[in-house]
Amino acid sequence: MSLSMYQASVPVLIHNLKALAGILKKGADHARARGIDPAVLVDARLFPDMFPLARQVQIATDMAKGGAARLAGVEIPSFPDTEASFPELQERIARTIAFLKSITPAQLEGSEQRAVNLQMRMGAVSFTGQYYLLSWVMPNVYFHVTTAYNILRHNGVELGKWDFLGKAPGANIKAGKPAKKPAKKRAPRKA
């Protein structure tokens, strides 16, 4: 089985951003239900030297749109990093998803060998497209989505693993009662 660069990127990025949107919705609902100023959660951090929730969302969306654009050879949409509320963060995610949906499989054909050159604080970095996607873009998206999840969970938002995983488009999950665990056999009692 071969997996195309498109299959390994665009649908997976969209899936993760939809999960992030669901996580943020639960954060906003939590704040509303408990009378918490939503800005407290949007500005929350896990530790003082870490980025706040808003910045985690900005970086996750920047990585997603930047990764797809570089692999497709198109201009990266520029979003100012000014979001300060849950609705603004949701809008940023929606704009990123809309951009990702504009990328076609044909645009990513052959991108596994495309040169991707980035200028970072540590200096210039060069990747092949495949290495860039699998070792830079995807781990960064997962990291920042996970950190957003952790910030909200740390602040009491009721989130679970399924919130992070999101609704898997190819999965056939049937809701209902969990399967019963088999009863343990007990050794006969000695008299």
Where are the regions a protein language model picked out?
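Alpha-helical scaffold segments that form or flank carboxylate-/histidine-based iron centers
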Residues: 2-15, 37-60, 80-89, 121-140, ...
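Structural signal for well-ordered, non-membrane alpha-helices
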Residues: 17, 21-28, 65-68, 94-101, ...
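Helix-loop segments that flank and shape redox-cofactor active sites
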Residues: 23-51, 67-81
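Conserved alpha-helical segments that form or flank metal/cofactor-binding pockets of metalloenzymes
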Residues: 49-76, 96-104
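A structural boundary/capping signal
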Residues: 71-77, 101-121, 125, 129, ...
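Mid-length scaffold segments of soluble, non-membrane domains
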Residues: 88-95, 104-107
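C-terminal or internal capping secondary-structure element at the end of a domain, subdomain, or sheet
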Residues: 130, 134-174
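Intrinsically disordered, polybasic Lys/Arg-rich low-complexity tracts
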Residues: 173-191
